[in-house]
Amino acid sequence: MLSDLYEEIKLRKTQPKEGSYTNYLFEKGLDKILKKVGEETTEVVIAAKNNNEELISEITDLTYHLLVLLAEKDIPLEDIKQELQSREGKLSKTSDRKEINDL
């Protein structure tokens, strides 16, 4: 499903459709896309404190905007899949992770 959505988003980039929100984002450019990713990320954090339906909705919005960002930067979805696979099963010690300092 994500692959299909990503392909549709890429298609909008090369074959604009009048009135499409995806086209609007591409027309406005990277800064607008990044702004939306930031907004949606914040909304996910807030929704996580509320009910699951709201959280699901916000994660869906964030996922869509991340796919638009990938398409804007011409990063294949396959690259993300490969990166996730490369991390699968790898153990990480908290002492090796500088960003984790309050466990």
From Swiss-Prot:
Homology family: Belongs to the PRA-PH family.
Protein name: Phosphoribosyl-ATP pyrophosphatase
Protein's pathway: Amino-acid biosynthesis; L-histidine biosynthesis; L-histidine from 5-phospho-alpha-D-ribose 1-diphosphate: step 2/9
Keywords: Amino-acid biosynthesis, ATP-binding, Cytoplasm, Histidine biosynthesis, Hydrolase, Nucleotide-binding
Region (Disordered): 84-103
Residues making up the signal peptide according to the UniProt record: none
Recorded GO MF terms: ATP binding; phosphoribosyl-ATP diphosphatase activity
Enzyme Commission number, as recorded: 3.6.1.31
Keyword check for Protein biosynthesis: no
Lineage: Bacteria, Bacillati, Bacillota, Bacilli, Bacillales
Subcellular location: Cytoplasm
GO cellular component term, pick one: cytoplasm
Top-level EC class as recorded in UniProt: hydrolase
Gene Ontology BP term (one): L-histidine biosynthetic process
Catalytic function, reaction form: 1-(5-phospho-beta-D-ribosyl)-ATP + H2O = 1-(5-phospho-beta-D-ribosyl)-5'-AMP + diphosphate + H(+)
PANTHER family: HISTIDINE BIOSYNTHESIS BIFUNCTIONAL PROTEIN (PTHR42945), HISTIDINE BIOSYNTHESIS BIFUNCTIONAL PROTEIN HISIE (PTHR42945:SF9)
The keyword Heme is assigned to this record: no
InterPro entries reported in the protein's UniProt record: HisE, PRib-ATP_PPHydrolase-like
